[in-house]
Amino acid sequence: MAPSFGSYIAGCLALIGIIAALGLGGYWLRRWIVPEFSGALARLADATLAVALLVVSLQILGSLSLLYFGWIVVFCIGVGLGSAWLGYSKAGGHGREVAAPRVQDIALVIALGVASWTVAEWTFPAQSSLDFGMFGGDTTWYHMPFSAFIAQEHSTVHLHYTDPLRLAAWFYPASTELVNAATIVLFKSDWLAPLQNLIWLPIGLLAAWCIGRPYKVGPATLVAAAIVLDAGVMIETQPGEARNDIMGLAFLLAFAAFLINGHQRRAPAAGAVQDAPESDAPLLDKGPLIMAGIAAGLAASVKTTFLVPVVAIAIGVVIFSGRGRRWTSAWVMGLPMLVVGGYWYLRAAIKTGGNPIPITKFGPLNLPRPDQMPLDPRPRFAVIDYITNATIYRRWFFPELENAFGPLWPLILIMAVSAAVYIAWKSRNKILRVIAVASLLTAVVYVFTPLTAAGQEGSPTGFFTNTRYLVPGLVLAMALLPLARPIRAPDRRAWQTLLFLTGVFAITVLTTPRWFTSYLVGTVFLTLCLVWAPAALSLARSRGSVSRPAIAAGAVVLVLLAVVLGRAQQVQYADQHYVNPDPFLGEGGPKEAYVYTQKLHDQRIGIIGSSQIIFGQYGFYGNDASNHVEYIGVHGPHGANRLPTSCAQLRGLINQGDYDYLVMSQYTQDTGPYNTGVANPYQFPVYAWVKGDPAVMLVVKDNLASPQPDYVFKVEGKLDPSACKPEKRPEVPGEEPIE
């Protein structure tokens, strides 16, 4: 059942107030920090500051365990208005706006067309998720469970254990999940979660435009980035899901845009900038450095994979700042980067006893990390493991690269690498060289990253989805491509480059259309809100053809329409999501467990089992995401979570958890001595350990689930650990042998 109409209106008013206050705060802070920014660049800075204010505000509330409706509304609005007052009092009318070179109207139309198509194509999976639920593996494994847990606990202090895997996902940065948690609190529903990534996509496209803005090639840099952002792997993994790559990509591009525009602040009154600014000028003024640090912090607060390009670019900027300016550049950019992006790493360091990134020991430093069992979603092969295997290229890498980046993937990769190498080697612009080197370094690190070719040996089934880890370097390199001097000067050559990139975009996206007529009305409305209206109002305002009251009136109309349509969508989402998991889970997931637990409210559910339980666990949170779901494990030092290794231990943990229900598979691993004869010391018969206890009642038995049956038990009392029968099992590394 959907939340009441009154709670919906309260949530809408709260969200509108928060967005308005934080937007106002971002606007006036930008007027103070970078008064020279204008047009699209100013709007990008406004958005970046507003998002940073939101994320930091929620982190503060989460640290104080105050993520309640009232506190979120009052504190976020207060922070926004306080920031607006501070910016207004400090701005003082100082600083001259630097206008961008005027682009041709036809180039602007092409850029808007590409942006519209990209956003429109993203809306279809988003609307599908609003109808059926989010079924992406990472979404249901940890992204949405983290959001629901934070919303339920009203806190970011505690770790939420989702599995016993080596990755220790509960230490991942979680800014996207935190924003989703806030919307769950505001609306008493997670119905906005499938739409969140549609907010970050336009910010990423705007940032891509701004990368080329001072060179008069903004349309070309937008199109080049859109080739990657609208590629198959992005469409399959981002829109309509809680995966967070797009938020990181948006602010990584913003990081680059602020550095490039800040470096070229002394642009001529007309025409594009030259390759280098004044010889006696500092590399960057403090304002652009602050903005760059904020954007970099936001990117790093999303996903650890963004640390490579962020840190590489930051180090390069400091090095090239020159003697006598390096320390100033380091602290001016580094301080906001740490404030905005350091929260999750600080939390991890506190929980582990000193390690901000617990997935690694940092080599000789040997920092503490959780002692996880050596279990992975798939065998952890990297691309480098198959680097000389021609068969893998032919059967896996080449076909999946085509699925990920379209039929022109060889051309796209060649263009990206060539642009990055050329700019790193030949450009006289230090900032461009730093970004180019960072993009190449990110690609190299991707090749060596575990799980980029995950799967059984000789069968890297995880290669396609994990090409996402190549995307940060690829999108940076593609955005730099139109800045290479041989293809942007003179203007005629820049125009040819734009047309060529538009052709590549068209071939890439038109070969795999994902348009559904039943969603066209929603697509038109979302594209209107996210692309057409902002672009039209901004363009009209910059050319003086529309007054501010008219812009405000247009915004009010769109907001009112969104509120009306939103209620209908919220009700439909409550009635339909996760009701029919068959088209998505097929025979590979806990379908009957989904159907049963969707009817439960405010129940404590313990889960244990193999992959289908781990990766599908968000479906057990119930229709209103009110069930408290956690993986039943043995908590250890430094934030570890390990499998129980005996019947008595499992029953004791169930008693400690005070669960109302249990959801489990037959074994904790899909292969092992109990069913395949393969040696696997981590395959435990958890169903057999529990089923005979009179304190549990079997309510769901799904023998058709694959690769092994799933079960739901209702817990009616305390289980008896002493009643477990003696058994002899394979010895578990790191555990005492049990007879």
Feature locations, PLM:
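Hydrophobic, aromatic-rich transmembrane alpha-helices
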Residues: 203-204, 208-209, 318, 391-443, ...
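Membrane-embedded, hydrophobic transmembrane alpha-helices
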Residues: 1-101, 106, 487, 494-529, ...
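Transmembrane-helix signature of polytopic, membrane-embedded enzymes
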Residues: 36-46, 191-192, 208-231, 249-250, ...
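Membrane-proximal, lumen/periplasm-facing interface regions of secretory-pathway glyco-
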Residues: 126-138, 165, 458, 514-524, ...
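Short periplasmic/luminal acceptor-recognition loop of GT-C membrane glycosyltransferases, typified by
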Residues: 570-571, 585-632, 659-670
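Aromatic/acidic, Gly/Pro-rich catalytic loop(s) in extracytoplasmic/lumenal soluble domains
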Residues: 657-739
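Membrane-interface helix-loop-helix junctions at transmembrane boundaries of multi-pass membrane enzymes
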Residues: 97-105, 213-221, 269-287, 321-332, ...
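Membrane-lumen/periplasm interface segments of specific transmembrane helices
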Residues: 319, 327-415, 559-567
